[in-house]
Amino acid sequence: VKLLIALDVVERRPDSPPLRDALRRMLSASDDDVANELWDADGGPEIVTRTARRLALPAARPPEIVGRWGDTMLGIADVVATYRHVLEKAPAAWRDLILDALAAAPRHGSDGFDQYFGIPGVLPRPWAVKQGWSESPRDVVLHTSGLVGDGWRFVVVVLASFPVGTDWATAAAAVNDEVTALAPGL
């Protein structure tokens, strides 16, 4: 979802240098405070609707609860199309900012969560990743997605949800197993 928020900013406010540092923090350290500010300032669910229409993301749906941007529904094809858009259609300066931020993802997100599961936990660099994690009354979610290989040759996406009560270590191990299974083809 944070990639959709970033792409919406690029489309609607392309000449906004102060947003560059904020977007960099939101994407690399998965900073929820920045995402919350941009979500509220730019129309919340309309961000998903606008960006999904512009990028032709067939499964993208805004969250049922307006303020829970992390509950936005995206299919794997939507995530792949989003990365392709960044690579092929985003303005060069913004593309570089987005890719540099994703490639600089620190081990721990701004909330202290260990982001090195899935792609960064299993695959060697180069990679540029956007990790996702959340708990809700319905499930525990852990996603890893990104670009890997020289020249960002491959898009890798693993979207995983687990029963309520699943601990993060168990979820991360399962996501790591999925990426490990994909690794020989990369």
Annotated model-derived regions:
Residues 11-25, 30, 42-45, 94:
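Short, well-structured active-site flanking segments
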Residues 6, 28-32, 79:
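Acidic/polar active-site rim loop that often engages polyanionic ligands
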Residues 40-186:
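Penicillin-recognizing serine hydrolase domain
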Residues 1, 32, 151:
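Short, flexible active-site-adjacent loop segments at beta-strand->alpha-helix junctions, enriched
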Residues 29, 33, 86-89:
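Alpha-helix C-capping/helix-to-loop hinge sites
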Residues 1-15, 26, 156:
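Active-site SXXK
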